[in-house]
């Protein structure tokens, strides 16, 4: 039986009419929250990765648009229900374009737009704005519940598999940050780790530093230290040596988009881990809510991979000084996501509905069938 959940870090502070987001680009050296007052504020927070993690991006976007709309109504900038409706639709389109790879943002705002389209625009501006606020708050609350289910299903499945070869406690390898900082609470992949820790079944979690933004080193380790979760930080390039020399029971990662055939877009370096896990016989799992499933995209070949500024590789994040020599024949390639083929997800896809293992033959996953499950 799983133990009750503990309090975790919060990157999203919301009360009706007010939203503050933790600036994750400054962690762990500074803890700074920024108020979101306008739609432009939430767009910038997502684009500049002050808020990051597919679930957190979607939740923050919904709440940010809600707060910005309410403020405009309160100051009289939006005077009618039809003006509010038009502003909401335009805002959803605007924020949707802030980051292209994570499907949660697109799905969330697409669904919200569909509901806004059905609003009665003849009602007063305040009532139309309030209706959207309630929708956004429901998105926030739902994400917490999804994470709780993911962590329980994932921990139980991994423990059951480990017991088959005599392991009572497990060691997990992960990448990037998929915890409370990347979601509304608890996390997806790191949520599974949390549940193992709460149940006293975690031997250790190994966290890849996750260059170039160091989300593993800056954020995952930060969460683990705050809660006393046993954690070892490794360089990204040490993963193969770790799997060879230490007992790793499973690799558990998050996702920004899971295509119909199981191909998974996630933080750059995830594909590397999947290849290494396959070679070393370590089960590889992806943990994500069904909000991250994209049955409309056939495979990873059709996913737009975001590329970011070369300075993220060439410049020290803290000092802002360039640490790489420059020259006319030097080029920098900085994709921030990669595609892990579904066939390499050997353990399964963990969602709030349970753990879906791979089929024996291609395609190894049928994402539409997972979405359709009750």
Swiss-Prot record:
A Gene Ontology biological process term: L-methionine salvage from methylthioadenosine
UniProt catalytic activity: 5-(methylsulfanyl)-alpha-D-ribose 1-phosphate = 5-(methylsulfanyl)-D-ribulose 1-phosphate
Class of enzymatic activity (EC top level): isomerase
Site-annotated residues for Transition state stabilizer: 176
Coiled coil spans: none
Subcellular location per the Swiss-Prot or TrEMBL entry: Cytoplasm; Nucleus
InterPro entries reported in the protein's UniProt record: IF-2B-related, IF-M1Pi, IF_2B-like_C, Initiation_fac_2B_a/b/d, M1Pi_N, NagB/RpiA_transferase-like
Active site, UniProt feature: 256
Domain of life the protein comes from: Eukaryota
Keywords: Amino-acid biosynthesis, Cytoplasm, Isomerase, Methionine biosynthesis, Nucleus
GO molecular function: S-methyl-5-thioribose-1-phosphate isomerase activity
UniProt keyword Cytoplasm present: yes
Pathway participation: Amino-acid biosynthesis; L-methionine biosynthesis via salvage pathway; L-methionine from S-methyl-5-thio-alpha-D-ribose 1-phosphate: step 1/6
Keyword Amino-acid biosynthesis assigned: yes
UniProt EC number: 5.3.1.23
GO cellular component: cytoplasm; nucleus
Pfam families linked to this entry: IF-2B
Family per similarity comment: Belongs to the eIF-2B alpha/beta/delta subunits family. MtnA subfamily.
Physiological role: Catalyzes the interconversion of methylthioribose-1-phosphate (MTR-1-P) into methylthioribulose-1-phosphate (MTRu-1-P).
PANTHER family per UniProt: METHYLTHIORIBOSE-1-PHOSPHATE ISOMERASE
Name of the protein in its database record: Methylthioribose-1-phosphate isomerase
């Amino acid at each position: 039986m799983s133990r009750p959940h503990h309090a975790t870090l919060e990157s999203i502070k919301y009360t009706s009419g007010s939203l503050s987001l933790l600036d994750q680009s400054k962690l762990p050296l500074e803890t700074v929250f920024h108020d979101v007052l306008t739609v432009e504020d939430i767009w910038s927070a997502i684009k500049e990765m002050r808020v990051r993690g597919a679930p957190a991006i979607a939740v923050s976007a919904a709440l940010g648009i809600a707060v910005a709309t309410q403020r405009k109504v309160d100051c009289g900038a939006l005077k009618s229900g039809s003006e509010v409706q038009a502003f909401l639709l335009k805002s959803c389109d605007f924020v949707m374009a802030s980051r292209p790879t994570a499907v949660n943002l697109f799905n969330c705002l697409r669904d919200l737009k569909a509901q806004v389209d059905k609003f009665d625009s003849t009602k007063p501006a305040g009532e139309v704005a309030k209706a959207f606020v309630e929708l956004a708050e429901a998105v926030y609350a739902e994400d917490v519940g999804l994470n709780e289910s993911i962590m329980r299903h994932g921990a139980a499945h991994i423990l059951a598999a480990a017991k088959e070869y005599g392991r009572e406690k497990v060691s997990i390898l992960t990448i990037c940050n998929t915890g409370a900082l990347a979601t509304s609470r608890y996390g997806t992949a790191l949520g599974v780790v949390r549940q193992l820790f709460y149940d006293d079944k975690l031997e250790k979690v190994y966290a890849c530093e996750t260059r170039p933004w160091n989300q593993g080193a800056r954020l995952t380790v930060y969460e683990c230290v705050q809660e006393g979760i046993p954690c070892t930080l490794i360089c990204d390039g040490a993963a193969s040596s770790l799997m060879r020399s230490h007992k790793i029971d499973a690799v558990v990662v998050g996702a920004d988009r899971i295509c119909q055939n199981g191909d998974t877009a996630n933080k750059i370096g995830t594909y590397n881990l999947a290849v290494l896990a396959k070679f070393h016989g370590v089960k590889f799992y992806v943990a994500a809510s069904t909000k991250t499933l994209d049955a409309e995209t056939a495979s990873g070949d059709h996913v737009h991979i975001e590329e970011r500024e070369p300075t993220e590789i060439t410049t020290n994040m803290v000092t802002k000084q360039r640490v790489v020599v420059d020259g006319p024949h030097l080029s920098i390639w900085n994709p921030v996501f990669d595609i892990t083929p579904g066939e390499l997800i050997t353990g399964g896809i963990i969602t709030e509905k349970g753990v879906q293992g791979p089929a024996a033959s291609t395609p190894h996953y049928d994402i539409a069938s997972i979405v359709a499950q009750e």
